Structure formats: C-alpha cells, structure tokens
Amino acid sequence: MVFHLPDSMDYSQGSLVEPLAVAMRAVNLTHFQLSETVAVIGAGTIGLLTILAARMKGAAKIIVSDVNSHRLTMAKKLGADVIINASEADPLSIIRAETGGKGAAAVIEAVGITATANQSLFAVRNGGFVTWIGNSDPDVTINMQQIVTRELTLRGSYGFNQEFEYAIEAVKSGLIDPTILIEQTASLSDGPRIIDDLASGKSDLIKVILNP
C-alpha cells in the first residue's frame, strides 16, 4: 500500500508517520473515557508517540514508566503528566497513588517482555483495559488470575489500518508534531557508526535522520 505525503510535509515529518500510525492504532483499540488516566509502560519510539495519541483521544492524565532517564525526559516534553523511572521506584505504587488506589483506566504496554506484561495487569483498575503493543519476546508468562478475577480486557495491537491516513492528517494539520523525537541529523556515511552506537548502548538517541 502506498500513501501520498502532502507537499506541505517534509521527509523528516514523513519518516515518523509510520510509527505514529502504529501508536494511534493501539490507542484506537484501547477503551478509556475522556478525563480518565492512561498508563504507558515503555518509552521507546512507539511508547512515546502513544503519549501524543492518547492525549489527542482525551486522556486527562498520562503516566509513563521506563528505565531510561533520557527517554523519560522526552516523555515529559511530549506531555506526560507523571514519569516513573522503574529502575529507581516501583511503578505500581506510584500509579496507584496517582489514581486514588484504583489503578489506571487503561494501560498500554510497549515493551513486550514478561515483567512488563504482568506489570500492565497489576497497573490497571478492576474492569480496566490493557493493550499490548510491545513485541519483544515470543513467549511470556502472565498471571491469568489477574485477568479473570478482576475482569480485565486484554488485547493486542499490531501495525495499523486506516490510522496511517489519520497520522498523515494529524501531522499535516499540526495537531501532532512527532519531529521532537528526531535528536540528530547526520550523513548517510555516518549511519554504520550511529547504528553501532545505538545497538551497543553507547548512544540513547531516540530518532536519527540520515541524509544522502
């Protein structure tokens, strides 16, 4: 499928339409009401863009948890109301404190490992909605009793559908500006070094644009 980018959009904006569409898909599939609290577990590119999509849908309070302080700083810039460094504090305790002890109305898990998958089940309120968008480990072990006895709704989200068109329009209209995630612009020849630095953990840049 091919989508035409409007002439008013540059390639930097265009490069972030796909991950924004993925984030918008997850939010569209997640049930919460206006003025409710949404928790996002994982502040990678998709998790960060989920902040923008959740706010656009009407989330009143957005809580973001991650172990990377740089990503959490970016989450705050994007509008997260509460950020939690999970390597320094217990996310569940803070989420409960921020929601009057009930838990978030909805939780979007954007990591995809056993620890955070289970964390998402404990972070949501009774009868709440959990969406998994993280896709790191093929097999995870979860606490099934949390789903059954607390009547949780759990679903997965993958890719996008009509959200790609929605993402284009949101960026074109200025409703969402995802380009804040672009932290460096470099030449294509610098690509191998930058990729190696990211893979090794030497760099924690979120998005880099490589120009010919």
Which residues does each predicted region cover?
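Mid-domain Rossmann-like dinucleotide-binding core that forms the NAD(H)/NADP(H) cofactor-binding site
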Residues: 9-88, 93
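Structural detector of well-ordered beta-strand residues that form the stable sheet scaffold
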Residues: 39, 63, 129-131, 155, ...
